[in-house]
């Protein structure tokens, strides 16, 4: 097991330590398939994952998202995940699944080559660790990398169980996804800009 860190002062990484983000990309560069199960995602991290999948020519990927079906999903993240799901299906490489049976709060990333898992990252980091934003820039995460084959197989088996129909479904097949509508504050406080009341929005 190798510990992986966030690089946030005053607890910055030293020359012998590796960040979670750098390790993820390093393992992805060696893989042809990746299986991911996390609690939360962000729009920026979904875009970053898509870029990395293209960069390293990943042939098979499944992203399982665990908390939103019960808690509700931010609208922007939902539409980004839906778009990514459509792209991966069209490219024939994978899908985005939502865990529906319970709130899943695990965070695991399993990497494969030629059909066999060779490494896995597990710990506190959700997908958002791939792309720092204002909301998580000061959020310290700690994870670990394992290359123990028996542990990797156990983690792989766990993710495959999450993908079963009794636990999850493809995001595109879910018609009752609860969404959280986010307020756009980009024009708040700007002179001559008036906010339209919700009742007027519904009318139009």
Q: What kind of feature is each model-predicted range?
A:
Residues 1-204:
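PLD/PLD-like phosphodiesterase catalytic module centered on the HKD motif
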């Amino acid at each position: 097991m190798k510990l992986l860190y966030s690089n946030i002062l005053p607890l910055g990484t030293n020359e012998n330590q590796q960040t979670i983000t750098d390790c993820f990309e390093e393992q992805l560069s060696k893989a042809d398939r990746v299986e991911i199960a996390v609690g939360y995602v962000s729009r920026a991290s979904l875009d970053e994952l898509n870029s990395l999948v293209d960069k390293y020519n990943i042939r098979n990927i499944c992203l399982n998202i665990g908390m939103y079906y019960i808690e509700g999903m931010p609208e922007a993240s939902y539409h980004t995940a839906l778009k990514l799901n459509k792209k991966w299906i069209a490219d024939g490489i994978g899908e985005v699944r939502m865990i529906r049976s319970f709130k899943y709060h695990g965070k695991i990333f399993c990497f494969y080559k030629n059909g066999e898992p060779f490494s896995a990252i597990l710990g506190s980091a959700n997908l958002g660790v791939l792309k720092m934003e204002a909301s998580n820039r000061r959020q310290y995460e700690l994870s670990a990398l394992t290359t123990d084959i028996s542990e990797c197989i156990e983690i792989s088996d766990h993710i495959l169980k999450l993908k079963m129909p009794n636990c999850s479904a493809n995001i595109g097949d879910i018609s009752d996804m609860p969404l959280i509508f986010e307020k756009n504050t980009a024009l708040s406080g700007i002179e001559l800009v008036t906010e339209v009341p919700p009742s007027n929005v519904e009318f139009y």
